[in-house]
Swiss-Prot record:
SUPFAM superfamilies: alpha/beta-Hydrolases
Keyword tags: Glycoprotein, Hydrolase, Protease, Serine protease, Signal, Virulence
Active site, UniProt feature: S174 (charge relay system), D450 (charge relay system)
Annotated GO biological process: proteolysis
Protein name as annotated: Serine protease vicPa
Species: Bipolaris victoriae (strain FI3)
Class of the enzyme per the UniProt entry, highest EC level: hydrolase
Glycan-modified residues: N65, N126, N297, N416, N436
Coiled-coil annotated spans: none
Length: 534
């Protein structure tokens, strides 16, 4: 009976011209699966400028894993590593990460596509300001949509993996999760469903809210100590004598920095490490810092008990000792630039010197320059000190102008091209919807204590409060964790992460089934219309 129905459908297609994309998904494969291509890679000729074909193309690298693929018409699990070279993120093809785990559940293939200007996917031979003009949000989104619509995947000789014939599920984390959300908003109906973990969808210039989840989740003794330390630093740098300022800089090994805002920024930087902590970690620099400030022997401080009144001078001395012995040594030298060589060199923290080699490093391997371009141009999200009405663990000497000054030095005007032309956080949020995203078949997850949560749909700073979950846009807030914890299978040791992953995978599985149902309905309706016409 099944064979008869299949032959009947194919005959209808051949005789009556039934569109190829209305064939049901779960029919037997017409072309056998090529088992020699369980994994591999390819090169896609991508448009440099999607609005001007004359600019040409570049080779965009992609990788695939068909270990769990059910054959032609089965789901495609799509992933991009965003601001990283793909060769450093190939584990996302496997079931040690969420994309591979979803593929295993729904019998899908994982396809990983490298982001333009990262890794091997380079439109030009250097990263000059003029060459970077094609690195824009709309070009990036168009890349992935164009890939999905036109790629010939080498493991599917039948062509049944086109998004109109198979459900493409885009899974993203962090920046790539924002791309997931923005694609669903701006170019819908190409990908069938979306999973966005830790998506920072609302752009802000003075992103002081970044550190709020850190303050809520970190050991509270450490929080109050850091708040007191940063308050003291700001007080000295804003109103202290020249001798007091120099003495404080020297205490932290930063006497070679000329600018006070650079020094204050350097002293604030270690708290950013909070966002890197995963539930499966057995050691974290952030807790090492907290242990040092509190003069604790433990290397893994997770307590939240509030202790006695802060002894500022003791905490300041402990922080200075940790900063100069554990954090600072080798920090600049590790960059590899000769003008930043030396174990105790601190010049990489100087953002105002246009002569630094890093500011003129146009090599395509310089991922920092590419990401700086995107931050300076589109996303902003500069981590700054909190308003004076709030306690802060990040210096108030660091504001958006501090970052803009650096952007101007890194990207001078060239061939009438400059950074951030007519782009503001308001204009980006108007385009994308910001944290007021309402979509279809898109699932958001965020960690309760993820600093990036403050720019997400689950932000407590969102005017209407954290967005509520709906059937078409489920939102999961994972208790007690930081950034993108649900992307890694090793984090399933945490009960809340495990439950979030299971819920998310179950939702994606239902949406995959919905795709088959919708396609079957389309075929039935089309066939009925044909018979009625005859």
């Amino acid at each position: 009976m099944l064979c008869y129905l299949l032959i009947h459908i194919l005959c209808l297609q051949a005789v009556l011209g039934v569109p190829y994309d209305v064939l049901p998904l779960r029919i037997p494969a017409l072309v056998p699966k090529d088992t020699s291509l369980l994994s591999g890679r390819g090169a896609f000729q991508q448009l440099i400028d999607h609005t001007n074909l004359d600019v040409g193309t570049f080779s965009q690298s992609y990788w695939f894993n068909t270990t769990y693929w059910g054959g032609p018409g089965s789901p495609i699990i799509f992933y991009t590593p965003g601001q990283h070279a793909a060769t450093d993120r190939l584990h996302y093809l496997t079931d040690t990460t969420l994309p591979g785990l979803v593929a295993k559940e729904v019998r899908g293939a994982v396809v990983l596509v490298e982001h333009r200007y990262f890794g091997e996917s380079q439109p030009f031979s250097n990263l000059s300001t003029a060459n970077l003009q094609y690195l824009t949000l709309d070009q990036v989104l168009a890349d992935f949509v164009h890939f999905a619509r036109t790629v010939d995947l080498p493991f599917d000789l039948s062509g049944q993996s086109h998004p109109s014939r198979a459900p493409w599920i885009w899974i993203g984390n962090s920046y790539s999760a924002a791309l997931v959300a923005w694609t669903e908003k701006l170019i819908p109906n190409v990908f069938w469903a979306y999973y966005a973990s830790g998506a920072m969808v609302n752009c802000m210039q003075d992103f002081w809210q970044f550190n709020y989840p850190t303050q809520q989740g970190m050991p509270q003794d450490c929080r109050y100590s850091l708040e007191a330390i940063i308050s003291h630093v700001d007080s000295v740098f804003l109103s202290g004598s020249p001798e007091q300022k120099h003495r404080l800089k020297t205490r932290f090994g930063l006497q070679d920095l000329d600018r006070l805002d650079d020094t204050a920024s350097a002293l604030s930087r270690p708290v950013i490490a909070w966002t890197l902590i995963q539930p499966s970690d057995t050691h974290a620099q952030f807790f090492e810092m907290c242990d040092a400030i509190g003069n604790l022997n433990s290397s893994w401080s997770r307590g939240h008990k509030v202790g006695s009144e802060i002894n500022l001078q003791k905490a300041l001395g402990n922080y200075a000792n940790w900063f100069t012995t554990s954090y600072l040594p080798g920090l600049c030298e590790s960059s590899g630039y000769s003008d930043w060589a030396g174990r105790n060199n601190v010049q990489c923290l100087d953002t105002a010197n246009p002569s630094w080699q890093a500011f003129h490093d146009l090599a395509v391997q310089n991922e920092d320059r590419v990401w700086d371009w995107m931050i300076c141009n589109f996303f902003l999200l500069w981590q700054t000190g909190a308003p004076v009405s709030r306690p802060t663990i990040f210096s108030r000497l660091v504001d958006s102008m501090y970052y803009k000054r650096r952007c101007k030095l890194i990207f001078p005007e060239e061939e009438n091209v400059t950074y951030a032309a007519r782009v503001t956080d308001d204009s980006i949020n108007t385009l994308t919807g910001g944290w007021n995203h309402t979509g279809k078949r898109i699932l958001f997850t965020n960690g309760e204590f993820d600093p990036w949560r403050s720019a997400s749909v689950s932000s407590v700073f969102r005017p209407d409060g954290p967005m509520q979950s709906t059937s078409q846009q489920p939102i999961i807030l994972i208790k007690g964790v930081q950034h993108q914890a649900d992307m890694y299978v090793r984090n399933r040791i945490n009960k809340d992460v495990r439950e979030a992953m299971d819920t998310g995978i179950a939702q994606i599985s239902r949406w995959v089934l919905d795709f088959h149902v919708e396609k079957s309905k389309t075929l039935t309706q089309y066939t009925s219309q044909v018979y009625c016409a005859h």
